[in-house]
């Protein structure tokens, strides 16, 4: 079985706006992207997660985005199926760091107890070694953005 070990992570970029004027509930949209690039020897990989949250009225009242990169060492990768397993493991290990950054931003801006919903990454749905479909092509290769529902 292939295993990923988080070696280090860093916040690459953060954007935040809070122009809420009154207390109460607000409807939010959330989207994320996640991809993993493997070294040719299969012993290392870099995972990249981007998450954004904004108000459903266009993001002018509330917007937060965090871009986090993690470096992993990998054991037992022998093929594409192993890479799919590691892909899911990298997300599971990197998500809590990204979640903490967004929680701290929200807490500091007067929105306590904010929680993002963690996606379930099914290894069977992971594409290995293929570019995204034309309609999913990111504006910038280093920061793709795809919506989730």
At which residue positions do the language-model features occur?
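N-terminal intrinsically disordered, cationic/polar leader segments
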Residues: 1-93, 100-103, 107-149
């Amino acid at each position: 079985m292939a295993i990923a070990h988080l070696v280090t992570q860093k916040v690459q970029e953060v954007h935040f706006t809070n122009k809420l004027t009154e207390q109460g509930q607000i409807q939010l949209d959330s989207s994320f992207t996640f991809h993993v690039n493997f070294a040719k020897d299969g012993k290392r990989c870099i995972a990249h997660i981007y998450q954004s949250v904004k108000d459903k009225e266009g993001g002018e009242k509330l917007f937060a985005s965090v871009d986090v990169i993690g470096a992993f060492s990998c054991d037992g990768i022998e093929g594409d199926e192993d890479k799919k397993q590691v892909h899911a493991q990298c997300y599971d290990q990197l998500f809590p760091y990204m979640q903490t950054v967004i929680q701290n931003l929200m807490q500091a801006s007067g929105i306590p107890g904010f929680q993002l919903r963690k996606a379930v990454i099914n290894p069977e749905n992971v594409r290995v070694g293929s570019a995204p479909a034309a309609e999913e092509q990111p504006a910038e290769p280093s920061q793709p953005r795809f919506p989730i529902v």
